[in-house]
């Protein structure tokens, strides 16, 4: 506001001109985060079962099963369309693949509310077998863990726009439970530790090796919806504001083949059937169907976790040396660790 000094009369609250400017500010040109009136603290149901048994004096078995169902807190955008209660509705305008197209018409002026939605589920099973030796100074453990986790959203950020759009979806406002981006379906672990007393009984030296072999994280393919021009939101970014479309995580429609009727292989469908368009189509179909293995989703929108990244292996080594301190009860602990010895071999 011209002539308004927000620092006038420090310690006495906001000057009147500042308060008036806030009152007069048009909400349509502001980014707004709010908590929906219907929001309640999310609830979870959890079942945890653990079984342990000593198979001998030196051999232990442990099995664990964890199941949970969790309501999630997630953001939904309000684009100016009528609400039912406090809930935004699904737009009637749809893309050729069936997903809704929203009608946001601002630039970095989205309105996002925090709502409840249900539900994600999680199943985790683990089995571990441990063998001690050398009078307890050595231990060998092998374990296997399996995860089956579905969630609505990964909630990957501290800001509403990133939480809204960073985790892949068909319709961000009406998410369906899909495979978690954090799921490790299979994990094998072997750990060997051995303690020795080269420097005396009060100065143990422990050597530890940990080998891990695990399946790759879930992956999925998305559209590039990065769009700054408001007039192109609906045609290029499913109607989302630039602050939301820049995450480009709209799950990709998988074409049936080079002749899929809802796909254009040239700009604005202006050069279909040309050698360049045909070559482009064949390259994309080969990538999606053969490289990523998504042919089973042809003619539909592939879900999150439609493929897995490669398995990973690691071998970590650590030496821990305990030394006496300056006082009777003091200890000095020195640790040397090498993360993934396999990198030194390969």
Where are these regions (language model features)?
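Extracytoplasmic gating/loop element in the C-terminal half of outer-membrane beta-barrel translocons
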Residues: 20, 206-326, 333
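Gram-negative outer-membrane beta-barrel transporters
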Residues: 62-221, 291
